[in-house]
Amino acid sequence: MATVTAALVKELRERTAAGMMDCKKALVEADGDIELAIDNMRKSGAAKAAKKSGNIAAEGTIIIKEVDGIAAILEVNCQTDFVAKDASFLAFANEVADAALAGRVEVAELQAAFEEKRIALVTKIGENISIRRVEFIEGAQIGSYRHGDRIGVVVVVVASDADQETIKQVAMHVAASKPEFVTPEDVPADVVAKEKQIQIDIAIQSGKPAEIAEKMVVGRMKKFTGEVSLTGQAFIMDPAQTVGQMLKAKGATVTNFIRFEVGEGIEKAKEMSFAEEVAAVQKG
């Protein structure tokens, strides 16, 4: 049996970023053959990653990258907020975002290109990691804002007088107020029709005649389309005016925006209470 030296363990650690004991064990099992040890560790890592893939990854980070009028916004997920702050995890997410922007690479291609590195990271960290989504936005004036690592916004503004601070404030507003559309006119007809019927039913159930209910709903629908659209919302920096009014005063128009929030739309596993955990342990 070959001698496993400290130098071999050190080299394997540098090449794989695995723990010292894992490296020593792999070298012993490979009889000191470092290349075989690496192959075995990769196979073992893939198996571990496959087992972890069923775990819900609803924490993570939002990364924004921008160059030459194009911005990429990316979500990479993990299982806990502790790992979401891990340097290795964040380095991985930034590397993926750089690659996405450089080649305008869609998510399926990114997932394939980074699968080997993802598996290595899962093995190192011990949590499921997933490249969830990426979107791109173009424009001469792009503003962005990240609220911590959990919320990211990019906006495209066509402006004559709006400075970068104003554009950033619009991005901050999107982060805080969660508009779904740019203007009230952008709200799809099916969304408007569905909400209108709900409001009519509410009015009728309150005892109003159908013709009166129809008239009441007109005002409610104007309020609804304003609340779900960026330009119709009260500007968080100055609630006395809407975002649309502020932009008009600046000679500016928002043409598009994207808002990502970590874990939105992912159904998280129900957390067990202490009593439930004890009961589960007793059941074996």
Curated annotation (Swiss-Prot):
It comes from Photobacterium profundum (strain SS9). GO terms for molecular function: translation elongation factor activity. Associates with the EF-Tu.GDP complex and induces the exchange of GDP to GTP. It remains bound to the aminoacyl-tRNA.EF-Tu.GTP complex up to the GTP hydrolysis stage on the ribosome. Keywords: Cytoplasm, Elongation factor, Protein biosynthesis. It is found in: Cytoplasm. It comes from the Bacteria. InterPro entries: EF-Ts_dimer_sf, Transl_elong_EFTs/EF1B, Transl_elong_EFTs/EF1B_dimer, Transl_elong_Ts_CS, UBA-like_sf. GO terms for cellular component: cytoplasm. The lineage of its organism: Bacteria, Pseudomonadati, Pseudomonadota, Gammaproteobacteria, Vibrionales. This is Elongation factor Ts.
